């Protein structure tokens, strides 16, 4: 029972990017399709984990608030920043959320600048 509780806590603590990677692994290796509401639940759990990073102020999370009118350019930038595939980057841009987490201020500002230049609304948390 303790193992299941630890597994559940690990899943709830995933960032949006980690949840996307988990979804891909489950789909490709095990043939498990995600439920329709899964992304919304994981995004809420990812925000809870971001609270600890805010207290430190040495690490920042880059959060995509809105892709803006030129979503294709934003998807291209997200792919370049994260190394995700086209489909995963598109899903991340459409859902919004953390693009990168736990980065130093200089890198976070650089990523924010690139995404804003592509037309996105970005916030550092």
UniProtKB/Swiss-Prot annotation:
GO terms for cellular component: cytosolic large ribosomal subunit. Coiled coil: none annotated. InterPro entries: Ribosomal_bL12, Ribosomal_bL12_C, Ribosomal_bL12_C/ClpS-like, Ribosomal_bL12_oligo, Ribosomal_bL12_oligo_N_sf. GO terms for biological process: translation. Homodimer. Part of the ribosomal stalk of the 50S ribosomal subunit. Forms a multimeric L10(L12)X complex, where L10 forms an elongated spine to which 2 to 4 L12 dimers bind in a sequential fashion. Binds GTP-bound translation factors. Forms part of the ribosomal stalk which helps the ribosome interact with GTP-bound translation factors. Is thus essential for accurate translation. This is Large ribosomal subunit protein bL12. It comes from Ruegeria sp. (strain TM1040).
């Amino acid at each position: 029972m303790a193992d299941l509780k630890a597994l559940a806590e690990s899943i709830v603590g995933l960032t949006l990017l980690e949840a996307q990677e988990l979804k891909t692994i489950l789909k490709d290796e095990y043939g498990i399709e995600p439920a329709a509401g899964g992304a919304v639940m994981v995004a809420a759990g990812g925000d809870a984990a971001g609270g600890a990073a805010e207290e430190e102020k040495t690490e920042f999370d880059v959060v995509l608030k809105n892709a803006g009118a030129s979503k294709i350019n934003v998807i291209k930038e997200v792919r370049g920043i994260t190394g995700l595939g086209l489909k995963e980057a598109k899903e991340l841009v459409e859902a919004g959320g953390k693009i990168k987490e736990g980065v130093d201020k200089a890198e976070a500002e650089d990523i924010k600048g690139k995404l804003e230049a592509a037309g996105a609304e970005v916030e550092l948390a």
